[in-house]
Amino acid sequence: MSDLIELQRNYLIGVLNQIETKNNLKFLIIDKTVETILSYLFLTPQELLNNVTSVDLIDSPTRKGQSSIEAIYILEPTKYNINCIDADFMVRPPKYRRCHIRFLPGLTNPIFQFFQSKRYIAQNLESFKPIELGFFVKESQFFETLQMEHSLQVFFNNNCKALIPTNVRKIVGSLVSLCVITGEYPIVRYSVSNPVEEEDARNGNAVVNANSLTRSIANAFQIAIDTYARNNPDFPPQNTERPRSILIITDRTLDPFAPILHDFSYQAMAYDLVANVDTQKDIYHYSAENEAGEQEEKVSKLVDLYDPDWIDLKHQHIMDANEYIQGRIKELIAKNPLLVDRSNVKNTTDLLSVVAHLKDFDEERRRLILHKTLVDECLGENAERKLADISAIEQNLSGFGMDFSGEKIKHIIDDLLPALAMKEPTILDKLRYIIAYALFRGGIIELDFIKLLNFIGVTHEHENFQQYLKIFRNYDLIDFKLIKDKPKDKPFQKEWFHDTLVNDPNIYHTSRFVPAVGNILSKVIANPLLLSEQYFPYLKDKPIELLNEEEFQAGLANTSANSSSSLRNPRHKAAWTTKSSNIKKNIPRQRFFYYVIGGISIPEIKAAYDQSNLKNRDIFIGSDEILTPTKFLDEVERLQNPREFFKFKEDQRQQVNPPDFLLREMKPVAQPVSHVHLKSQDNSPKSGTSSPKAAGSLKSEPPEKEKKRSKFSRFLKRKSHHDK
């Protein structure tokens, strides 16, 4: 299975190693955005210091230079960063001998002209190239576009429409980076909510329609990746038999159920239910017993790079995760009988206390205590709110009105009302049930919404009454008219792409829902003809031939996905033209890219992993941000708020002038110490001297964001266990 963390790490190291310097000494200067990228790629600073001599934040007051050593700058292309670089060479002696500048995606023409105007940079510039690091690798198969915030507002709030072009360029930069790092030149398909309007638009009969967002991003990406391929003859790689990849671009309107249903996998429950999980930073705050028997406050990262147990556990059903952790605890204790006093062990809580007192197992013990504590919190919230007991109503509503046996439920409201009458679920839980019911019905009148709110105790006098009503109304802005004007109005018409599982003894009753992500990927992997071209048209490259009935059945049998021909790359031959009997077992797996505009839920990310494992394919899924159910409903409620409310970074005054300390004359410092671990010099061709004019082919990207000044401590001074 390909690992996006490893792929991005190797790409970055490759960029660093291609830059040859005297004695192979290199100072790396970064900004806060790149620091965050590095935090997802390198477990310890030493991993990065094997490739460079030192790493510093560009605006750190403790950054020391050396006028005989060359510097590599990997930064966002902002006026502030450019001025900081210029200041490094304005002082005498200059901080560094020469500079190699690598800007992240986002270089606009105005910023490029500003860059060209800097005299000291021009005099000391050794090389200047883009670096394709347009996303954070949050997980081995999930990536997040850089510097996006409130993406649902950007794309669906009419007051924020002016921000769309900037953020489209960010997404395009993210997708191009993905393709460069993976060496893929994908076939592009995009989702369409209204095929009739889409056909008119493609024929030039309509300028704007409901599908313009996905199509515009697909078009912009195609132009950008084609430009990259023209400017880089070695892209895509020629020496591989991997079938051509497929990129599917969708948006948040494709699946309204995924962000609101209660999901019972471990990560989804933790991010939905546990208040002490910081979902923005992927950090869990908790208390645990230490060796002295005292409760101690802890902070742990829930990130793939730091925690192999998290990788194994996060997508398991909570009951399976609990069983796994208990088994691991018992196994650890069983392997160390001489270190354990079993006399007081009566339950799993006692087992956890025993583990806390085990010595010589610090890291394993830390992870077991962490996950046992978090799993217990999830189970506790579930028990207190009776969520699993009520889950059948959600599964039935999202399952087209069918129960676990596949039987159609005649009066589903009779199941909903008892759930709403229960005292254990929170008001927000019940609100999610009501929205699921309205989606199932294709909309209900506002009076019925008010009656249901009153039924759960939210009357006109309730402090959140107007807030909840606004959520119902604002669903119309994301293409779901939940509130019908009249009782006799027809339900809204919507093509559903999610699915439900019935009569399957191998699944939990709480987990029948299949997000649209999983259903779409399942179809396109099995055979592209299974995925409606009407709702998922090809942007450019279309399969070179159609299957006849016999070939279609063969395609279903061998689960090969389609590709299209390309004169550029021989591996772009249609996958189904090779008979299954001739397929080599060692042929690399086809890759599928899936992007959701407007935010993604954790169950949708999990669905991509599930299909990757089931279909034996590499799947990388990305979005602008992760949406928990609470965050999603908050964003929907604010879809009519003015742009000023959100305080977008684009709307804030950005720092331009460099810090004063960078302009002070620096004193010569000692030669670098000889014991620094350096990577042996490679045989890569030297990055030739190039003027800023040589970068004229760089993609235009959005204005970048304000930089913060702080010490480079979060990455370089990170504790080895990432746990306080």
Swiss-Prot record:
> Region annotation Disordered: residue ranges?
675-724
One GO process term, biological-process aspect: positive regulation of vesicle fusion
UniProt keyword annotation of Protein transport present: yes
Q: What InterPro entries does this protein map onto?
A: Sec-1-like_dom1, Sec-1-like_dom3a, Sec1-like, Sec1-like_dom2, Sec1-like_sf
Q: Where is the composition biased (Basic residues)?
A: 708-724
- Keyword field: Protein transport, Transport
Any single Gene Ontology cellular-component annotation: plasma membrane
Give the Pfam families listed for this entry. Answer: Sec1
UniProt feature, compositional bias: Polar residues? 681-692
Statement: the UniProt record of this protein carries the keyword Glycoprotein: no
Signal sequence range: none
One GO molecular function term of this record is: SNARE binding
Q: What else is known?
A: Present with 639 molecules/cell in log phase SD medium.
| Function field | Involved in the final stage of protein secretion.
- Record PANTHER family: VESICLE PROTEIN SORTING-ASSOCIATED (PTHR11679)
Assembly? Interacts with MSO1.
According to its UniProt record, which protein family does this protein belong to? Belongs to the STXBP/unc-18/SEC1 family.
- What is the protein name stated in its UniProt record? Protein transport protein SEC1
Identify the taxonomic lineage of the organism of origin.
Eukaryota, Fungi, Dikarya, Ascomycota, Saccharomycotina
